[in-house]
UniProtKB/Swiss-Prot annotation:
One of its GO terms (biological process) is reductive pentose-phosphate cycle. SUPFAM superfamilies: RuBisCo, C-terminal domain, RuBisCO, large subunit, small (N-terminal) domain. This is Ribulose bisphosphate carboxylase large chain. Belongs to the RuBisCO large chain family. Type I subfamily. The keyword Methyltransferase does not apply.
């Protein structure tokens, strides 16, 4: 082998493996308005320079492969390569970097969250050069978000359908989540709605098990719903879980729900998958059903601080795929979630335009243009004494879900529901009068409970 070839090989190739940095690390790249931008938290293996690790992430999630192939010459790679625009060290963390990657819009299929994720978080998370990798945030440009229909209805249309304004909505997950017969399940639904809640909810595990088949559950819940509506004069809903083993079965359940005339169905969007979720969202939009989204399995993806994908990414994807409600953490209950980043999720779900704010974990300014908002649902270990805090944290456009907080009431389900409704109305009224809920909250609830 001539010495000339040897030197050439050592520049660009090591045993056939490309030095990704040459093609993909472009610190002088100016991002375009149509690029999808990603912020990755990269933890390189010892000895791997950050720039190389960042470029590896960019390469594997776009056009790269481990060697040079002759078909590269048959296309214009520069047009379609993702570019790692910048890598900045994370303050206070050793060996962690935030890598910013820009993806040209042409890399993605329109209207497909599935394709977007397959590209951006597909193979790259198993990469040898990285000890850990976390997708912290995505900026979805209007040019791409406009190819999605988004939520079937959105916040305003939901309020109009339910005729409920000026306060958060109240929900309750029926417990025990598994084991009740359809008749007893329907009875619990009726008692909660009759007591004053707006919604009750199937737990995410309730699909169609031997002790309660889905059709039986749907029928008893619809009966409970109509009875409670007739007695209270308010519109009521029960999230009927349409999640099933196949897309066809799921749509069949949604059709049955529509035939019963109920207002809302539910889907587990991470276990069910984005493709199924988008299909169901389109069906709900066409047929006037609201769609509640449960995020079962999210902690598998977002719990690790240095690996996985942050929940704000999964939430943005849901807003594009379609859903009218999604559980977004509580700040005060039994599940993990700090106040600032939870409020960040909530704004990304509800607002039209969200400014970049690193203190809340928002890496990019996100402009949703006119895509409808998603109502965040606070659920998980909250009870009536959390009401002042919840009213203050979430504001009016939220659903507050008390499972054990309703059904665990010593006097029974209906009084539990009454307690929640009374506390909510008292807190909203006090807030509107300008009282400080953080200071006087418990006193306000005690006062209200005297007369209810």
């Amino acid at each position: 082998m001539s010495p000339q070839t040897e030197t050439k090989a050592s520049v660009g190739f090591k045993a056939g493996v490309k030095d990704y940095k040459l093609t993909y690390y472009t610190p002088d790249y100016e991002t375009k308005d149509t690029d999808i931008l990603a912020a990755f938290r990269v933890t390189p293996q010892p000895g791997v320079p950050p720039x190389x690790x960042x470029x590896x992430x960019x390469x594997e999630s776009s056009t790269g492969t481990w060697t040079t192939v002759w078909t590269d010459g048959x296309t214009s790679l520069d047009r379609x390569x993702x570019x790692x625009x910048x890598x900045x060290x994370v303050p206070g963390e050793e060996n962690q970097y935030i890598a910013y990657v820009a993806y040209p819009l042409d890399l993605f299929e329109e209207g497909s969250v599935t394709n977007m994720f397959t590209s951006i978080v597909g193979n790259v998370f198993g990469f040898k050069a990285l000890r850990a990798l976390r997708l912290e945030d995505l900026r979805i440009p209007p040019a791409y978000s406009k190819t999605f229909l988004g939520p079937p209805h959105g916040i305003q249309v939901e309020r109009d359908k339910l005729n409920k304004y000026g306060r958060p909505l109240l929900g309750c997950t029926i417990k025990p989540k598994l084991g009740l017969s359809a008749k007893n399940y329907g009875r619990a639904v009726y008692e909660c709605l009759r007591g004053g809640l707006d919604f009750t909810k199937d737990d995410e595990n309730v699909n169609s098990q031997p002790f309660m088949r889905w059709r039986x559950x749907f029928l008893f819940c619809a009966e409970a719903l109509y009875k409670a509506q007739a007695e209270t004069g308010e519109i009521k809903g029960h999230y009927l879980n349409a999640t099933a083993g196949t897309c066809e079965e799921m749509i069949k359940r949604a059709v049955f729900a529509r035939e019963l005339g109920v207002p809302i169905v539910m889907h587990d969007y991470l276990t069910g998958g984005f493709t199924a979720n988008t299909s169901l969202a389109h069906y709900c939009r066409d047929n006037g059903l609201l769609l509640h989204i449960h995020r079962a399995m999210h902690a598998v993806i977002d719990r690790q601080k240095n690996h996985g994908x942050x929940f704000r990414v999964x939430x943005k994807a849901l807003r594009m795929s379609g859903g009218d409600h999604i559980x977004x953490g509580t700040v005060v209950g039994k599940l993990e979630g700090d106040r600032e980043s939870t409020l960040g999720f909530v704004d990304l779900l509800r607002d039209d335009y969200i400014e970049k704010d690193r203190s809340r974990g928002i890496f990019f300014t996100q402009d949703w243009v006119s895509m409808p908002g998603v109502i965040p649902v606070a659920s998980g270990g909250i009870h009536v004494w959390h009401m002042p805090a919840l009213t203050e944290i979430f504001g009016d456009d939220a659903v507050l879900q008390f499972g054990g907080g309703t059904l665990g009431h010593p006097w029974g389900n209906a009084p539990g529901a009454v307690a929640n409704r009374v506390a909510l109305e008292a807190c909203v009224q006090a807030r509107n009068e300008g009282r400080d809920l953080a200071v006087e909250g418990n006193e306000i609830i005690r006062e209200a409970s005297k007369w209810s």
